[in-house]
């Protein structure tokens, strides 16, 4: 697989979970002999939802909720077949969304 690059994008609501997952991926890749660029922190996406506190009236009294999506980017340069196999077997937490591009 010479000259190839694997790009991994991670998304999660909890920054501690995504950082530990990125650390696991980087450790696994370096152990198998491929080189790694990252993890690169991408901009955090922040969604704010505004809700009226009262069910009937008092429109001036509102409550704001926000949901933050943390993102990380990892590039694996010149992966070996052993690298790909170990990434397939890697167990990551349920709260992390993984997107892999070859």
Curated annotation (Swiss-Prot):
Q: Does the keyword Zinc-finger apply?
A: no
Secretion signal, residue range per the UniProt entry: none
What are the protein's UniProt keywords? Ribonucleoprotein, Ribosomal protein
Query: Which GO terms are recorded in the biological process aspect for this UniProt protein?
Result: translation
Q: Which Pfam families match?
A: Ribosomal_S10 (PF00338)
Which GO terms fall under molecular function for this chain's record? structural constituent of ribosome; tRNA binding
Ribosomal protein: is it a keyword of this entry?
A: yes
List GO terms (cellular component aspect). ribonucleoprotein complex; ribosome
Source organism, top-level taxon? Bacteria
Give the InterPro entries listed for this entry.
Answer: Ribosomal_uS10, Ribosomal_uS10_CS, Ribosomal_uS10_dom, Ribosomal_uS10_dom_sf
Q: Which family does it belong to?
A: Belongs to the universal ribosomal protein uS10 family.
Subunit structure of this chain's protein: Part of the 30S ribosomal subunit.
What this protein is reported to do is described as: Involved in the binding of tRNA to the ribosomes.
Provide the protein name.
Answer: Small ribosomal subunit protein uS10
Source species: Kineococcus radiotolerans (strain ATCC BAA-149 / DSM 14245 / SRS30216)
Encoding gene, per UniProt annotation: rpsJ
């Amino acid at each position: 697989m010479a000259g190839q690059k694997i790009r991994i994008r991670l998304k999660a609501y909890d920054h501690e979970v995504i950082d530990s997952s990125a650390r696991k991926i980087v450790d696994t890749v370096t152990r198998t002999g491929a080189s790694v660029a990252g993890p690169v922190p991408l901009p955090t996406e922040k969604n704010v939802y505004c809700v009226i506190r009262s069910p009937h009236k008092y429109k001036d009294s509102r409550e704001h909720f926000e949901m933050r999506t943390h993102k990380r980017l990892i590039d694996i340069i010149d992966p070996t077949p052993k690298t790909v196999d170990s990434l397939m077997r890697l167990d990551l937490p349920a709260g992390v969304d993984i997107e892999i591009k070859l």
